[in-house]
């Protein structure tokens, strides 16, 4: 197809698209990468290596902030708090959550991915690759509820992560299969490519550890620390007192600590102790495990891949988890009794605190867009950001010199 014909077709499609939108499209400044996407010569190759061009020359929406929820309970408080008047359906989203919600001028948008790693990766891929959305300067707030480690937080507490660690990528043996031969093992998990729980994995998939922008995380914490959190119910207060840890007994507050990702919903002292050690192992002692989630590493893997090609800015991602329950029982209960008969009831406070703690950074981004956030310079990362493979450049402050890739 001739380039002139392509431009004519594109103009026609753009015009038709405009007529199908219920409300006026906000005219916004286009990125240089998009302005030149179709003006480039078609590349030639002599080695059979065809490389696709990228950019979204016909993007309509350029949100400043995007809230990522995982399921309806995390989504609903945002829908009540924000003036989301537009519903945008795009291919590839969860069949349960097929719509993206945006404010009147499309400045703030929200997506619900569906729970678990596969749903998160699928939905975020669909969003970031969709031609209607230019996300090159968008800030992302992953906001969900999680289990909490009582050493560092309490029910209703708010956590902002620097690291996300995927703990499910390991070998696993049942207790009956290892306790006689390896009685000193904490659990039946063993890192890939090793036969020792205290040895760094010999081979990796690349999604085991992610690190996000510490300066932006700290800004979000600074703003969230100024608001009054929901402290929960009298029942929450009584349940907190069943724990010995100071953090668990206290009122909810905003803390800097890190997130674990596992599709397996785990609980109890045995697995918590092991995964706490595994977190230290995987991050060379840098991360502090305090929240259990099911999606963060999946979301960050998609963001890493797309950031490599300039479709998102990995420096503009924040991970916030509020605590709906403890990840281990109080001393007076067994793990079984706690998990199946618990009465901590912290989910209400955790859901309200998603909005209470997340709104300040969202508003700060929108209100100070031209002065601070558009360029991203003030809160650009000084720490390493990215995955264990250094996909985005730099040198990870975790991992080891080389791996076998699985």
Curated annotation (Swiss-Prot):
Family membership: Belongs to the NUP family.
Signal peptide span: 1-22
GO MF entry, a single one: catalytic activity
InterPro entries: Nucleoside_phosphorylase_sf, Pur_nuclsid_perm
The gene coding this protein: NUP
Any single biological process term in GO: transmembrane transport
Organism annotation: Candida albicans
Task performed by this protein: Nucleoside permease that transports adenosine and guanosine. Does not show any transport activities towards cytidine, adenine, guanine, uridine, and uracil.
Regions crossing the membrane: none
Highest taxon, organism lineage: Eukaryota
Protein name, as recorded: Purine nucleoside permease
Record's keyword terms, sorted: Signal, Transport
Activity control note: Mammalian nucleoside transport inhibitors dipyridamole and NBMPR inhibit adenosine transport by NUP.
A cellular component annotation (GO) from this entry: endoplasmic reticulum
């Amino acid at each position: 197809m001739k380039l002139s014909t392509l431009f004519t077709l594109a103009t026609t499609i753009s015009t038709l698209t405009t007529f199908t939108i219920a409300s006026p499209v906000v005219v916004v400044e286009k990125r240089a990468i998009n302005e030149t996407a179709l003006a480039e010569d078609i590349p030639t190759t002599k080695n059979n290596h065809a490389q696709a061009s990228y950019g979204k020359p016909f993007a309509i929406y350029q949100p400043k902030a995007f809230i990522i929820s995982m399921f309806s309970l995390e989504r609903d408080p945002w829908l009540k708090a924000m003036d989301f008047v537009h519903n945008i359906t795009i291919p590839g989203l969860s069949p349960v959550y097929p719509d993206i919600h945006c404010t009147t001028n499309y400045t703030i948008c929200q997506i619900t991915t569906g729970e678990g790693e596969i749903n998160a990766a699928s939905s975020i891929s669909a969003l970031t690759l969709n031609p209607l959305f230019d996300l090159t300067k968008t800030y992302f707030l992953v906001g969900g509820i999680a289990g909490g480690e009582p050493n560092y937080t309490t029910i209703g507490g708010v956590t902002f992560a620097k690291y996300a660690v995927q703990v499910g990528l390991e070998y696993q043996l049942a207790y009956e299969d290892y306790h006689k031969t390896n009685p000193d093992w904490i659990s039946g998990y063993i890192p890939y490519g090793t036969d020792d729980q205290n040895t760094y994995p010999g081979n990796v998939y690349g999604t085991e550890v992610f690190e996000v922008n510490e300066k932006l995380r700290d800004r979000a914490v600074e703003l969230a620390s100024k608001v009054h959190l929901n402290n929960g119910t009298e029942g929450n207060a009584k349940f907190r007192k069943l724990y010995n840890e100071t953090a668990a007994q206290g009122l909810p507050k905003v803390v800097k600590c890190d997130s674990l990702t596992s599709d397996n919903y785990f609980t109890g002292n045995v697995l918590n102790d092991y995964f706490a050690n595994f977190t230290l192992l995987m991050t060379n002692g840098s991360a502090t495990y305090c929240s259990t989630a099911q999606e963060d590493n999946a979301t960050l893997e998609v963001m890493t891949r797309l950031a490599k090609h300039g479709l998102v800015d990995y420096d503009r991602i924040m991970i916030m988890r509020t605590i709906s329950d403890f990840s281990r029982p109080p001393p007076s209960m067994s793990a079984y009794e706690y998990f199946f008969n618990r009465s901590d009831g912290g989910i209400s406070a955790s859901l309200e605190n998603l909005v209470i703690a997340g709104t300040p950074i969202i508003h700060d981004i929108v209100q100070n867009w031209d002065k601070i956030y558009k360029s991203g310079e003030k809160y650009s990362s000084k720490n390493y950001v990215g995955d264990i493979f250094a996909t985005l450049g730099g040198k990870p402050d975790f991992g080891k010199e080389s791996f076998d890739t699985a």
